[in-house]
Amino acid sequence: MKLFKNIFLVLFFVGFSVHLSSQPRTTDKIFSLESKILVISGHPNLEKSKANKAILKELEKHFGKQISIRRLDKLYPNYQINVKAEQEAIKNADFIILQFPLYWYGTPALLKKWIDDVLYDYFKGNRLSGKFKDKAIIASVTIGGSKERYSPPNKTVETYLIPLQETFEVIGAGWASPVYSFDAVPSNKNLSETAFQHFVKLIDLINEYKSTAAQGCW
């Protein structure tokens, strides 16, 4: 009788554990169709840009009220970042797209200043505070050089983005695969198509990321 009771208890707890593990984890981030998207435009002079401006226009047209675009060149021409305003913008975002041209194998100075000021003040030595835990970062990069220039045996685009990736991963953000386009120069006769295809890749990545997160794989 005692043996039967013990077997029953073991089976009960095993079954209960399986039931719990099959339930959705309430702490998992589930990106809805209404996910909030924040774009940080790091181009130092967007008015003179063709590719970056076209990409932002397509994003705004596609997402409408779901998207908020912060043009750093317009907001901070003197490079004096309003840290509190930027943190407020970040607070409710699910996706943060860093849109910028690759300058000397890195981000433009204005975007770097934004990262330095906003993240430093946000964490104040407590980088594991979890404030970025449920946010996905997408580096959306336009590159003036050719695809061959950034293919092996040369260094790849991903290599140049490692410092950016490490920065956001160390504070707990999700780092999505970067989206980048080559030959993003005015002399490219197909620049409009290049910008549009870049936009399409961004949409595909966001949808893929939502699907992955919903499955608990993020």
Enumerate the predicted regions with their spans.
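Structural motif
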Residues: 76-84, 187-194
